[in-house]
Amino acid sequence: MAQNIPTKRQSAFGVFVKSKVKGPTIQQTGATKTPKTPSKIRRLSIRKSTRKIKHALKGKSGSQPVAAHKDMPVTQNTGQGEEGVKLKGYKMKTSPARVQEPQRTGSPEENSIGKGNIKTNIKGSQNVQAGQKFQERIATQHPQKRKPFGIEDSDDKTPVKRVRSDTAKSVQSPAKAVDVGEVEDSTEEAEKMFEWLIHPVKKEKFFSELWEKKPLLVKRHLESYNDGWFSTEDLTKILHENDIQFGRNLDVTTYEGGQRETHNPPGRANPAVVWDYYQNGCSVRLLNPQTYSQGVWRLCSTLQEYFSSMVGANIYLTPPGTQGFAPHYDDIEAFVLQLEGNFSQEEIGEAILDVTLEPGDLLYFPRGTIHQASALPDTHSLHITVSTCQRNTWGDLMEKLVPAALTMAFSEDVEFRQALPRDYLDYMGLANADLDDPRRKAFLETLQSLLSRLVNYVPVDAGVDQKAVEFMRDCLPPVFTKNERACSIYGCRTRLEKGRVVGSVDLKTSTPVKLIRKGAARLVMEGEQVFLYHVLENARVYHGAELQPIEVPPEAAPAIEYLMHSYPEYVTVDSFPLDHQQDKIDLAMLMFEKGIIIAQEPASVDN
């Protein structure tokens, strides 16, 4: 949001970056001549600017910056639970499905996965230029001296971290993994996915030096590195096979002469209509690709467990020589990969970095980065935006904690209930801010004392549980492998044959079970009640339905905690810490029927 962006900022990726790195301010310059660039590339610019955000965004374009929460692709539930269902001490807490427009994430540059070339040109730092020349000389004259995990900037104080990878061929893309076995540990799988995303940068270095601090550019020199997630063929298939609606699922836009226009007609986005807009210079944005693409669904659902925050995606297709979106910024962390074609960055200030993204390359930039991009004249551009950590800050957590702490303090501490001084209006307020009055000093000291004591009443764990429930409401459901599906409720072969039910589910006390994913469920206290929240009934459309938590008897809570803490190991139903065997089976059946747990072997039998 605008109030979170400082006056001084550094720009990155055709964007101005929310500056947390000291450096010179930015000056607006005229447009520069676009250098010759090869086919199938995407050029982006990282630049500096002294102009205020509103001037940088409105001065030329006349459009406001777009916050990530207004543009983020969405993923979530469609089904509703049964109202008032009771099951041996358990009942469903239900509410009607909430209809909500999909959120959208800014522009084609924000976060993307794709194919492209990155050509860097960092200005304003002789040390960086000297380092680049040295690295190029080493690479050409002494290739054996290259670092095994890439060549990095010689100066960590540069506005953008640049890394060249020579080991990408040795890394298997998760998009090409065979979908047969099971996810033994979803935490490890999520970590592997993120390591693949930022390879060859080590995750420890990424979070200590780059995360929320500065952009990262990785050149991999391997076009196939990002293959398998999405393609123009996938987009065509989605348009033909699904009810894609203009405005809700897809936008067609242009940005010319400083004016951004959305050209969405009402109704379904039929392929012939979409491609006609495209032929006439419109950019195409698919807002929720995870709803229709198995690959994007898997990418987002895996990474959301790594970040403990919603991960969204947008697809952007831009015709040659055009631009679809005005400069803007988003309140999310963004990862950019180019899939097809090229993208260039229009000059909007002194360049910190001019980049040409090639297939397989990565560009990360922190929240607050102002960005815009356009396709080069010789080819189209296709990329995916992957974004995370929206409304997932310390401030967002404190919004929940502070009101609850005040309520408790009012109840338990008499000083919070004492009246304000009868004459405090005489020396407090803006009109009295410069008064040298001892009463004013005493007032502020009392307030500071109360604020320091307020910390003692903060219900941290309860507040974190509320954040966890919000996260689960935003989550995508997990992607089941073939084996997992066979061992879950979704693989049961229960059916009616000749008037007789066969293939019923059979869980015994000896059956080994485990959670489908570590983050698939959350046990939460709400007043005197205990609820089990889960994401298994979430839809792949954002907020397609409300969560359907299960109210469980308090005595069942230790057994659920036992299952959670045992992950990723299988445990037998008999090992549940409950007094009666039937209670163990009832709890296991309830969680199995909701998809929260899976058995080690297929659980349905023909009877």
Curated annotation (Swiss-Prot):
Subcellular location: Nucleus
Principal place of residence: nucleus
Top-rank taxon: Eukaryota
GO molecular function, one term: iron ion binding
Bias-annotated ranges (Polar residues): 25-37
Required cofactor names: Fe(2+)
Reactions catalysed according to its record: L-histidyl-[protein] + 2-oxoglutarate + O2 = (3S)-3-hydroxy-L-histidyl-[protein] + succinate + CO2; N(6),N(6)-dimethyl-L-lysyl(36)-[histone H3] + 2 2-oxoglutarate + 2 O2 = L-lysyl(36)-[histone H3] + 2 formaldehyde + 2 succinate + 2 CO2
Annotated positions binding Fe cation: H328, D330, H371
Presence of the UniProt keyword Coiled coil in the record: no
Cofactor note: Binds 1 Fe(2+) ion per subunit.
Domain (JmjC): residue spans on this chain: 188-405
BP GO terms, sorted: negative regulation of DNA-templated transcription
Protein name: Bifunctional lysine-specific demethylase and histidyl-hydroxylase NO66
Provenance organism: Branchiostoma floridae (Florida lancelet)
